[in-house]
Amino acid sequence: MANSDSAVLLNLYVQVAPADLFRLLQRQSGRIVRNGIYSARLVIWMMMNQRLQAGGTLARSVEQLVQGRFSPLLSRCKRVKEMRIGLSTGGYCQARQNLPKLLVSQTVNELIERLRQRMGKPTMEGQPRVYVLDGSSLQVEYSAELVKAYPQAQNRHGKSHRPVVRIVVLHDVDTGLAERPYWGPMYGPRAVSEQALGEQATKHVPAGSVIIGDRNFGIFSVAYHAQQQGHGTIVRLTAVRARKLVGGEISGAMDQPVQWRTSRWDGKKNRTWPADASVPGRLIAQQVGRGKHKQWLYLFTTLALPAEQIVACYGKHWRIETDLRSLKQTVRLQQLSVQSADMMEKELLVAVLAYNLVRTIMYLAAQRSGGDPRQLSFTYACNIVLDGYPTILAARGAKQQEQELNSIIDLVARCKLPKRKKRRSYPRGIWGRGFRFPIRKEEKTK
């Protein structure tokens, strides 16, 4: 990420994360607040800065600290006043490890709400938030602790090398803000499903929100728990499940009231609802697409909106695919270089917070230009925001800083994605990774 982009992000972080907030959260978590170089406020920012930089290392973050890049976040301890901040990464590394996970979690929850308020999108009655629910998987470094917590994938050829983490995130359809993620092991005896993680995620969004899910979440348990939590749902169903719901074949477009009743297969041993549980709603069947790409779309919804609006709302589901791509590639969540489960969870939370900071700048830029924040490039915006860091820090006074911030926001507003006149004529595809080295086999003990 460029320096100007970093400046804008730092300025926004300073505004939404004042030192008083961290002192309050630390006292609430029972931590003793010490006046040292690596305060919780500074450490969380340095971890975010690492996530947003292509070559983000501990050494690079400490170098930026010594050069004065993070001066607004430094406490006035003795070593800071004497300008005696060492280049060794040991102090920063220990500060990251000693950072309480509860404090990071509370900070993420608080800052997400503050960013939403900064966008001018507070929770309002009559205007429900619309979220897209989706899941993915992440890889982490091999270590005994991580392998025990998150077992590797396994097939007839043996086990994979890296532990795998399953993650589920709710993304705001309009702003692109990600809520706090939920995760668990993808394999092994304690493996958790995306649906179970999704039920945890929907518990922590305001009642009355609308949850959009693809066919993976088009099952009874997701609809039932969303109803119990006071949420509206729009979930896609498989053709088999749709036919079962209406009790017969579906020969054409339809919009029919249905009563989704639980079956003996739903939940199996993990069932947490009564045997006669049901969810009232509507089944909408429509053909979508063009020419030979036409296909049937089956949606179950508890909303009272017209069928055309329901289909259009579900059409926004694709946005989470680009959001997850930004999280895994630009914010570098695809593979986490950590050695402990505790550190993995903190890095995951901080990465989502860094992503939300960039999304906030993009939303503010779109507001100023009167455009759609979804038409801006996340990677371009991220680079511009980091490039503006020295400019804002060099500004004298709050007024000049605000002017520099506005100039960067205006620049971000120009990072528009290209408008294609027609769809690409070739099928989308990627080359497989292949095997660079022979598969390692375990020697059998005699």
For the regions a protein language model found, what residue spans apply to each?
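Single, function-defining residue in the core of a domain
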Residues: M1-R60, N98-L99, Q106-E110, E125-R129, ...
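DNA-recognition alpha helix
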Residues: T57-K81
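Generic beta-strand or strand-like secondary-structure segments
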Residues: Q64, G91-Q94, E110
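Major-groove recognition helix of helix-turn-helix-like DNA-binding domains
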Residues: S75-K101
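Noncatalytic, basic helical substrate-engagement surface that gates or grips nucleic-acid strands
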Residues: S88, V132-L133
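A short, well-structured juxtamembrane/interface segment
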Residues: E113-K121
